[in-house]
Amino acid sequence: MDFRELSKLAYDLRKDTVDMIVAGKGGHIGGDMSVMETLVTLYFDQMNISPENMNDPDRDLFVMSKGHSVEAYYAVLAKKGFLDIKEVNEKFSKFGTQYIGHPNNKLPGIEMNSGSLGHGLPVCVGMALAGKMNKKDYRVYTVMGDGELAEGSVWEAAMAGHQYKLDNLCAIVDRNRLQISGNTEDVMGHDDLHERFRSFGWHVIDVADGNSIEQLHAAFEEAKQTKGQPTVLIANTVKGKGSAVMEDKASWHHHVPSQEDRKSTRLNSSHLGISY
């Protein structure tokens, strides 16, 4: 798929995500919408991963560290062929289901249970180090929320990533600047996030528009060429991206959209020039 087709796919999957949250009567919709292009770029443009190679020790590895954005993750996994979207919508967030509100590695395609913030990067450091020790060529990716960076374990892992020169590790910060209690800078300010990661020995790539497939593609390609140190992408995204009523509003961190809200999610893709 080209960049335009991938952008359309991201909006299609936003619709699936909204439908899932409505059916389940709850979900972290704001972060789902902001991270969608990152997930689409990883799964449909970058990573060596498919339902057919999940037992391949050379497959790329992904951990959704900001596990509360699981609805977007489920939608992408379903499109990739790991899950059935109809079943997900029927069972999501229901009593006794495996389709719970955070990633569950009993489901196909999910490497790690996550959602307790600050755990994804430490585990990915271990995965990347194992790859180096076993002389494997796979790459390891994790997506973190910017609010998650208040967890100290993130920075312990960042220090270890530099120590072991894990150039097969790429972290992505979904930098939408909002969390459940408001603006991230008011809750626990990050100062200059780029310089902070650089001070820990990481190669830092600023993605000016983290909802641009083309910019994300270029950033991931640069990360692949970076040697001797891990890479972090600071993806500047918009919480609630794709919906006129949700964009850049902390109140949509966890919310169930109305029928009118669902319509706006599709209408706001008109800039792609693609008819639904």
Where are these regions (language model features)?
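N-terminal hydrophobic or amphipathic helices/low-complexity stretches enriched
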Residues: 1-13
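Cofactor-binding active-site loop characterized by glycine-rich and histidine/acidic residues
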Residues: 5, 17-20, 32-163
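N-terminal capping segment at the start of a domain
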Residues: 10-26, 174-176
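Histidine-centered active-site/metal-ligand motif
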Residues: 28, 68, 100-102, 119, ...
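Thiamine diphosphate
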Residues: 109, 113-116, 121-226
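Single conserved hydrophobic/aromatic residue that forms the stacking wall/gate
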Residues: 263-276
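Glycine/aspartate-rich loop-and-adjacent alpha/beta segment that forms the canonical ThDP
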Residues: 203, 213-266
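Glycine-rich beta-alpha junction loops
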Residues: 68-69, 73, 176-177, 237-240
